Every structure is written in C-alpha cells, then in structure tokens.
C-alpha cells in the first residue's frame, strides 16, 4: 500500500480537515457520526493531530461494514481495489510473460516463413496481436493511478456507510 499511498489510505485522507475530496457539509456529518459511535473521537485543529482519530475511525468503519449482504457496494469496491493493487504487484511478471509470448510468436513466424513448420499464419498473427495488446495493457493501463482511482472509489463507498441506516 505504501507504494501508492505513502502517508494515509484514501478514506483516512478524505477525513482530514485539509482534504477537499469530500465537501465540508458531508465531512461534518461524518465527524458527527464518528463522535456519536466512537468513544474519544474528536476533531482537531490540524491534520497531524487528526491522523490518529481518522485512522481509528476508518478502522472501526471497516470492521462494521464487513457484511457483504448489508454493504454490497463497499464489498465490490474493496474487491476492485484489491484486484487493481494485486495487478500492479504482478506488473513485472505480466510484462515479462507478454514479451516471452511476443518473442515466441516471432520465432514461430520466422520458422514458418523458412518452411521449418507448417502452422496457420492467421493463428500466429492473432496470437502476436493478443500478446502485443496484453503488453500494452500491462504497460499503460496497470499503473499506480489505476490503484489510486480504485482506492478513492473504495474510500467514497466506505465513508458513505456513515449515512446508512444499517450502522445506526
């Protein structure tokens, strides 16, 4: 997580006073909710003093929203977040496997054109295109920004549970 979120997770960061990811009215409503449900939760004047409180609040909220039947959107966004994070962790392997596939396809094409093997050229071209597309996907789509975006969506879904009747 430190690779994409070096300081705080998106839900924690969203609750800081300096953050503009959530409008101030909604943030005040969340603060009120946490004050009513978590003993010792308080709002501090600066972000550094607020960090332990928002971290505790998010941890508490995660533990209260684990039921997938009551909170399906949170479960879905958490799954998406975890999936994108795992993809980023596998990026080097994905690029390596795609490059090996491209090299293998080019070698087969070389052998085909020099009549060492008899293979349908359409299949070779199709598999080369597929490997190239996967290589492009690994390079340009699976990025830190994809994980950060998924993390922010999860944070939004998680914090919106404060407005749910299921927690009151």
Could you tell me what each predicted segment is?
Residues 38, 103, 162-165:
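Generic structural signal for hydrophobic core residues of well-folded globular domains
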Residues 20-24, 50, 128, 143-149:
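Alpha-helical interaction segments
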Residues 110-124, 132-133, 138, 158:
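A broad "ordered helical/assembly scaffold" signature
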Residues 11, 57, 75, 92, ...:
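A sequence-composition feature that detects small, non-aromatic residues
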Residues 41-122:
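Membrane-proximal, non-transmembrane alpha-helical segments
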């Amino acid at each position: 997580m430190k690779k994409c979120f070096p300081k705080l997770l998106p839900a924690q960061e969203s609750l800081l006073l300096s953050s503009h990811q959530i409008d101030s009215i909604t943030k005040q409503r969340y603060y009120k909710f946490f004050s009513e449900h978590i003993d010792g939760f308080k709002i501090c004047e600066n972000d550094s003093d607020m960090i332990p409180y928002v971290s505790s609040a998010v941890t508490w909220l995660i533990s209260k929203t684990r039921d997938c039947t009551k909170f399906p959107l949170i479960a879905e966004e958490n799954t998406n977040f975890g999936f994108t994070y795992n993809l980023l962790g596998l990026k080097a392997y994905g690029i390596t496997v795609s490059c090996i596939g491209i090299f293998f396809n080019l070698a087969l094409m070389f052998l085909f054109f020099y009549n060492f093997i008899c293979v349908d050229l359409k299949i070779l071209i199709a598999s080369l295109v597929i490997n190239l597309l996967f290589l492009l996907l690994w390079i340009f789509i699976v990025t830190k920004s994809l994980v950060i975006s998924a993390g922010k969506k999860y944070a939004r879904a998680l914090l919106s549970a404060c407005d749910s009747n299921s927690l009151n």
